[in-house]
Amino acid sequence: CDLGVAVRLVAEVLDEMGLTENTIAATSIGCSVTIYDFINVDSIEAPHGRALAVATGVKRAKPEKCVFTYSGDGDFASIGLAESMHAALRGEKITAICINNTTYGMTGGQLGPTTLLGQVTTTSPTGRNVPYYGYPIKIAEHIAMCDGTAYSARVSLDSVPNIRKAKQAIRKAFEAQEKGLGFGFVEILSSCPTNWRMTPEKAHDRVKNEMMEVFKPGVYKDITENNN
């Protein structure tokens, strides 16, 4: 899958911005939790869905620190939706990275908040349909509508050019925090070949041809340029 690429991008941005030694990561439950094994920053593990609640406490206790969360879409936008939205509404000076792979990856491929219409999962064996399961949530757009949000973007890891764009967006989200402007958010479209039961190549095709048709990449809010 693309989690290794996402972790590398976060690590590169922190290193290039000179923030590594001053950073605290708050992780939650899911595939994303292992980031602390691969990135050399202080970290704290939160209960499922509570990464931004924990990060809020850390940032308020240590406002001089760079604080970020790294979560999956199920963690960020399902069990942790209240914590995520209210951190943005409060304008917490935190950077949040959310990996959207349209499923619960670690627990076996169940339907999640971003599962596409028609997508078959272990808990939607006939495919997601609106009467039973509702619509997939468009996270970046919702976060952008919060007054406390300084930066909200959606990027993809399906190709080298898009990986470069993803790194730029991650940097912007950290810059929003460093400038004290408010909440910074990046939603990253990522493949999950195992639970999608696809080869990595086919999984990247799905990201491009299906996910990006519903979850449009782009910057949905950016006030960093007006506050240099």
Predicted stretch roles:
Residues 31-105, 168-172:
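Thiamine diphosphate
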Residues 78-95, 99, 103-228:
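Glycine-rich ThDP/TPP pyrophosphate-binding loop and its adjacent helix/strand module
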Residues 21-27, 69-70, 96-99, 151-154:
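General beta-strand structural signal in soluble alpha/beta enzymes
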Residues 17-19, 61-62, 177-178:
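Glycine-rich phosphate/diphosphate-binding loops that line cofactor/substrate pockets in enzymes
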Residues 21-23, 65-66, 93, 180-182:
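Short coil/turn segments at beta-strand junctions that form active-site/ligand-binding loops
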Residues 1-47:
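Active-site diphosphate/adenylate-binding microenvironment
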Residues 2-6, 50-54, 135, 139:
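Catalytic-loop motifs flanking and including active-site residues across diverse enzymes
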